[in-house]
């Protein structure tokens, strides 16, 4: 996995918009435990413990042992409720409570695809769907097939506005060029850069703000799957209880403020699955 150079900036970003990240709490009737996959420093678990003390048993899972150490320190100092912390393997070995648990996968899937192998990605989906969780809550980034399509004038207008922004912010211009090269795009001439699809533009707009950990963020694939592909993964023993595909309001406002681009493309989704008994 790509190194996180500034854990403080990374975890600060993770803490923002907790109300949106805990969108599923009023929809998981009967669940007794919340298992947060990719718990990072435990901020979301702490938020739930503070907002709803002792309503749920709380468990955090992360593949990054450095993050688990941060979570342990953070939660021991700031949280009254006992919260268990595990790697996925440790959780699978000891847990017998998935049947009445809600698995939360917030901004996890794109990281699994960015850093995983085909084998580890398959293992991830097996863990998600075969552990018997009562609910599975997923919140991440994805575009739909229809949103990827955009005519050249829309792409050109967005590139022009990004170029204007980069002229005012040379560091951002450097990031944009690095992003394009990493995405296997290329210069047509000295003054113009070709982006192959509207997806490339949206992908950049999703990540340009993360300058501190840019080397890591640049290489992550925020959009590994279309929403249609996500929905096709739902197995027959789960039903879709809630689904929303939307544009993150803060992102839309920030892109308009920085670039003057009206980002109407849906970039994020929430999906709640309920096990069929």
Where are these regions (language model features)?
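Class I (Rossmann-like) S-adenosyl-L-methionine-dependent methyltransferase catalytic domain
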Residues: 1-50, 55-95, 131-277
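A structural preference for long, well-packed, hydrophobic secondary-structure segments
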Residues: 85-86, 108, 122-125
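A conserved beta-strand element that flanks and buttresses the S-adenosyl-L-methionine
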Residues: 104
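Short catalytic micro-motifs in class I SAM-dependent methyltransferases
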Residues: 107-112, 140
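A short, conserved alpha-helix within the catalytic core of class I
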Residues: 112-128
């Amino acid at each position: 996995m790509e190194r996180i150079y500034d854990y403080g900036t990374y975890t600060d970003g993770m803490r923002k918009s907790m109300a949106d990240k805990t969108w599923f709490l009023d929809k998981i009737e009967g669940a007794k435990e919340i298992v947060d996959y990719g718990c990072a420093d435990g901020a979301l678990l702490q938020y739930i413990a503070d907002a709803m003390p002792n309503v749920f048993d709380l468990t955090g899972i992360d593949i990054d042992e450095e993050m688990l150490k941060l979570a342990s320190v953070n939660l021991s100092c700031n949280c009254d409720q006992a919260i268990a912390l595990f790697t996925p393997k440790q959780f699978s070995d000891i847990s017998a409570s998935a049947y009445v648990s809600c698995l939360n996968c917030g901004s996890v899937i794109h990281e699994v695809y960015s850093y995983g192998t085909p084998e580890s990605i398959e293992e991830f989906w097996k863990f998600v769907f075969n552990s018997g969780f009562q609910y599975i809550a997923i919140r991440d980034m994805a575009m739909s097939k229809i949103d990827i399509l955009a005519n050249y004038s829309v792409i050109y207008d967005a590139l022009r506005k990004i170029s204007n922004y980069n002229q005012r912010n040379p560091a951002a211009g450097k990031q944009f060029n690095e992003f394009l090269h990493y995405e296997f795009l290329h210069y047509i001439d000295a003054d113009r850069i070709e982006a192959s699809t509207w997806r490339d533009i949206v992908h950049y707009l999703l990540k340009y703000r993360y300058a501190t950990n840019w080397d890591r963020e640049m290489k992550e694939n925020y959009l590994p799957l279309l929403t249609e592909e996500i929905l096709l993964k739902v197995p027959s023993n789960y039903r879709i209880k809630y689904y929303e595909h939307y544009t993150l309001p803060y992102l839309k406002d920030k892109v308009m403020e920085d670039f003057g681009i009206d980002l109407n493309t849906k970039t994020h989704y929430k999906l709640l699955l309920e096990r069929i008994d």
